[in-house]
Regions:
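N-terminal secretory signal peptides that target proteins for export/translocation
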Residues: 1-7
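Bacterial N-terminal signal peptides
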Residues: 13-23
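Cleavable N-terminal signal peptides
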Residues: 16-17, 27-28, 93
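Bacterial Sec-dependent signal peptides at the C-terminal "C-region" and cleavage site
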Residues: 23-32
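Extracellular adhesion/carbohydrate-recognition regions
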Residues: 31-108, 184-188
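Short, flexible loop/turn elements at secondary-structure junctions
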Residues: 79, 115, 157, 189-191
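An exposed tryptophan-centered "aromatic clamp" motif
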Residues: 86-107, 113-167
Length: 192
């Protein structure tokens, strides 16, 4: 055993020296170079990316209506909440739209959920809802009137419930027909 250690001792010493030189170069050069640590890394200032361009092509018609050119749908500039200052359940929303005259038109209807998607704009983040809550900005163009509802009733309904479009997240939901909280309707018509 002693003979084995005598043979291996020079090899182990060389291995230890190689380890120190390879993995700890500052230790072997410390006396010669008076090792001084580098300055800490300072990252460049953050520059946010430019905003994405909107995919929508909205035109303010100047008569209380807005037209989305691609879909050729005409929308009321004010939704029911901005117009009346209160929320509406599904039944009241249907009646509101049926009796609406805006921009010289009286053929307004309740939109389907997919049609709300034609004015939902994820490049927008406007604090224009009825309570102006900065925690819940609407993905809606500032061409639309201030004081808007957070979500809108659609014409898609059953015996108890109807589909709605939520303009904070862009997700559709199902709500009971008599629900009212922070909701309304934005009337639409075909403009072809």
């Amino acid at each position: 055993m002693i003979q084995f250690l005598k043979i291996r001792a020079p090899f182990l010493s060389a291995l230890l020296l190689a380890f120190v030189v390879i993995f700890c170069p500052g230790v072997t050069n410390a006396e010669r170079n008076h090792y001084v640590p580098r300055d800490p890394y300072v990252a460049p200032p953050y520059v946010p990316p430019p905003p994405l361009p909107s995919r929508l092509n909205l035109i303010d018609n100047g008569d209380g209506t807005i037209t989305e050119k691609k879909s050729k749908l005409m929308w009321t500039k004010k939704d029911s909440f901005a117009d009346l200052g209160r929320c509406l359940n599904w039944y009241d929303s249907k009646s509101y739209v049926e009796n609406l005259t805006t921009g010289g038109h009286n053929d307004w209807r309740m939109p389907e959920v997919w049609e709300y998607g034609e004015i939902y704009d994820n490049t927008e983040s406007n604090v224009m809802a009825m309570d102006h809550d900065p925690e819940n900005p609407l993905a809606l163009s500032s061409l639309f009137a201030d004081g808007a509802a957070y979500w809108y009733w659609s014409s898609e309904h059953g015996k108890c419930c109807a589909r709605t479009a939520y303009f904070v997240t862009g997700l559709p939901f199902v709500r009971t027909l008599d629900k009212c909280s922070k909701g309304g309707v934005r009337a639409v018509r075909n403009n072809s």
